[in-house]
A protein has these predicted regions:
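Short, contiguous alpha-helical
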Residues: 1-21, 69-128, 162
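C-terminal interaction segments
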Residues: 149-182
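Short, contiguous, pocket-lining structural segments
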Residues: 42-46, 84-88, 154
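Short, helix-capping/interhelical loops that line the mouth of catalytic, cofactor-
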Residues: 1-60, 64-69
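An amphipathic alpha-helical core segment
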Residues: 115-154
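Structured loops at beta-to-helix junctions and adjacent beta-edge loops in soluble globular domains
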Residues: 99, 139, 165-168
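Short, structural beta-strand-to-alpha-helix junction motif
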Residues: 39, 80-81, 158
Length: 182
């Protein structure tokens, strides 16, 4: 929690410098700047050291703090801090895993039990936010078949490409034009 407070205090002012419209961009910019000189091994070492502490810190956040409202911007709107701690951080790290695998040319080891659960959760929130009917077939180990409403657009796409589309990493048309920032 101490690191998060540091990032808020130092990162939020960076939003003006980088012409950002979302508060989290300043935090990301601060993380990049503070770690730009580190080697890959040093970054990995920091992650090994801090990662478990950060997860424990999430779970130790006092209940009153977990309900403090935070602005996520459209389409998510205002959500309690617990949304960020329980949902947002997990999805963010998972989505960056997709980015890293693509950037390094490594295959992403996907399972229905882990990755499929994340994808299903994302589909459910996405459907609730935009409310447009759809019949969605997501291919691959993290995929599944999802239906929302009746007589909706039929979409067949790889599960990971679906996530990349919702997050703006690739263009979306039709029902896939509704974003869900992760």
């Amino acid at each position: 929690m101490r690191e998060f407070a540091h990032q808020l205090r130092r990162g939020l002012p960076l939003n003006k410098q980088i012409d950002s419209h979302h508060w989290v961009d300043g935090l990301n910019e601060l993380q990049i700047r503070e770690r730009a000189s580190l080697s890959d091994a040093e970054l990995a070492g920091q992650l090994k050291e801090v990662g478990p502490k950060a997860v424990r810190g999430r779970w130790r956040t006092p209940p009153p703090m977990r309900y403090l409202p935070l602005p996520f911007g459209p389409p998510i709107g205002w959500q309690p801090l617990k949304y960020l701690l329980d949902v947002g951080f997990t999805r963010d790290v998972w989505c960056h895993r997709i980015d890293i695998c693509r950037a390094t040319g490594r295959p992403m080891d996907l399972t229905a039990g882990h990755d499929g659960r994340l994808v299903a959760d994302i589909v459910a929130e996405w459907a609730a936010i935009h409310r447009e009917p759809f019949d969605l077939v997501l291919d691959g180990p993290a995929g599944g078949t999802f239906r929302h409403g009746h007589d909706g657009e039929h979409v067949d796409i790889d599960a990971i490409e679906y996530i990349r589309t919702l997050t703006g990493r690739r263009p979306g048309r039709g029902v896939l034009s509704h974003p869900l920032p992760l």
